[in-house]
């Protein structure tokens, strides 16, 4: 076990703060509409240019191990805020630095760090309640567009794309961001339920130009097993053929004699049919078959519940307005399932999301909610170069998360104004002792830091702007992009309440832990002896 280097008290804290300041100073230049870019070197390929705070934070590792500990703790602030709210990473870093730098003065003056932390926590609770109380719901197209534009660093086209996507697939729909192939941004929307399984045989395709099978008002048969014997399907096929409607079979697999007979009947026009493998594997396949059943009003034919395929009737089949099956995907549009049953199923899956601890499981469950509730939208990013593409994708991802947060908890005045206004909630607030009251005042001063940084990045004087904003009321603030004072909501400068709240909570949490740190321990690097020179070979000197 290697020897340890241990530092105590002020010498430990001063090293930690030095690391915090290096990371925070690199991150905070990106804040606001006039925030600057940060260029990150890559070991291969072109440098990465970004205005995304968490991307900058993740790249920083310091040589001094004590300073690096401070930097990594603040990096944790931006990562946590990013995970929960999807944006506000730079704001969180600026707040953490401000709380720490204000607090360390009091610790150095001999105040009790634990009481200071308790005071900060009391103040944070009051400010968070104020933010929640002043938040306005973001349920209209314009508000969503404005939040998206601001989070994408004032890029209005991105805001419009996200608002259009949310309008098309609903607030529960899945919206993904991909790299496009052209110069322009584009939006692709798949309405209805889509899953990644195509037709089992290309002979099921009835549109030869697109190689797809299009079924209008079809019946849907769901089977939780492999089908290889055509005798099992005869009853169902005869019943469907009499109606003259097409049939989609979704099963674990269709093979052998059953597949050959279906293909022949389809090609001869006796019955229009298409067979598709069920999506997913194992328990997830069973769950997705049940989702499709509820969406289309079908019953899953499963031997586990004592049902046999030979006895299936038209009552067990589901229906939909239209189904399109390609080589790789199946899209079910406007399933005839009961709306209440679908809503109950969505609630049930949401409850599973709350209980799940795996990020992968949560993502898959969220996809199932989207497929039942709305649809899937894909925003395709266009750019001239790969470097620009990556930078833009970072911004669009941020904007997408921010708009989701806005829909969830509403919006507040942007540009750091909501935090400055929340200072009023600290008036008359005192702690159990003088040191706790000092902790409350630490947050009172630190809470102005985001607005100061936005103004500073815009090249204006922070103190002048802070005083002017404090003199106003409500949503009155400063538009750093234009240099104009006015109502922030009317000017379209909004922040999701969830982002502002998360940034403050995480910043105060980590800054409080740092203030109460009294010792730091790290490994002492071992001096490894240099490799000896290689011995000389016959007729040669020693190689160096």
Curated annotation (Swiss-Prot):
GO cellular component: cytoplasm
Domain of life per record: Bacteria
UniProt-listed SUPFAM superfamilies: GroEL apical domain-like, GroEL equatorial domain-like, GroEL-intermediate domain like
Keywords noted in UniProt: ATP-binding, Chaperone, Cytoplasm, Isomerase, Nucleotide-binding
Family: Belongs to the chaperonin (HSP60) family.
Subunit-structure text: Forms a cylinder of 14 subunits composed of two heptameric rings stacked back-to-back. Interacts with the co-chaperonin GroES.
Described function: Together with its co-chaperonin GroES, plays an essential role in assisting protein folding. The GroEL-GroES system forms a nano-cage that allows encapsulation of the non-native substrate proteins and provides a physical environment optimized to promote and accelerate protein folding.
Name by which UniProt lists this protein: Chaperonin GroEL
Organism: Acinetobacter baylyi (strain ATCC 33305 / BD413 / ADP1)
